[in-house]
């Protein structure tokens, strides 16, 4: 077993890496704000639409169903992120891992059927 000093030496390169990464990313975020010339112009603050004056407000209303479909997409996209590592390690996790994932898929299927029956996927 590693002693405390040996353990700290093992993690020292990782700590140095995170320190340098934090410093570089902070510099990248701060330096442009300090060094850039700031010329405020009315035209630069306008939304750009093919060189013409904007015809309409840039903010348009979306139907709430678009947000619902986006949330459903995120949920089922997360399902895939759980399925891929499970499928890769299926040979080593045994029956318990298999049946736990089947239960997970069953719960997601119940949720999908519920959304379908409630009409969340209908566009009419």
UniProtKB/Swiss-Prot annotation:
Signal peptide span: none
UniProt topology in membrane: Multi-pass membrane protein
Principal location: membrane
Catalytic activity reported: a quinone + NADH + 5 H(+)(in) = a quinol + NAD(+) + 4 H(+)(out)
Superkingdom of the source species: Bacteria
Annotated EC: 7.1.1.-
EC class name: translocase
TM helices/strands, residue ranges: 11-31, 68-88, 93-113
Keyword line: Cell inner membrane, Cell membrane, Membrane, NAD, Quinone, Translocase, Transmembrane, Transmembrane helix, Transport, Ubiquinone
GO molecular function, one term: NADH:ubiquinone reductase (non-electrogenic) activity
Record localization: Cell inner membrane
UniProt GO cellular component terms: NADH dehydrogenase complex; plasma membrane
Function description: NDH-1 shuttles electrons from NADH, via FMN and iron-sulfur (Fe-S) centers, to quinones in the respiratory chain. The immediate electron acceptor for the enzyme in this species is believed to be ubiquinone. Couples the redox reaction to proton translocation (for every two electrons transferred, four hydrogen ions are translocated across the cytoplasmic membrane), and thus conserves the redox energy in a proton gradient.
PANTHER family tied to this protein: NADH-UBIQUINONE OXIDOREDUCTASE CHAIN 3
Subunit structure: NDH-1 is composed of 14 different subunits. Subunits NuoA, H, J, K, L, M, N constitute the membrane sector of the complex.
Family the entry assigns: Belongs to the complex I subunit 3 family.
Official protein name in the record: NADH-quinone oxidoreductase subunit A
Organism: Rickettsia bellii (strain RML369-C)
Gene: nuoA
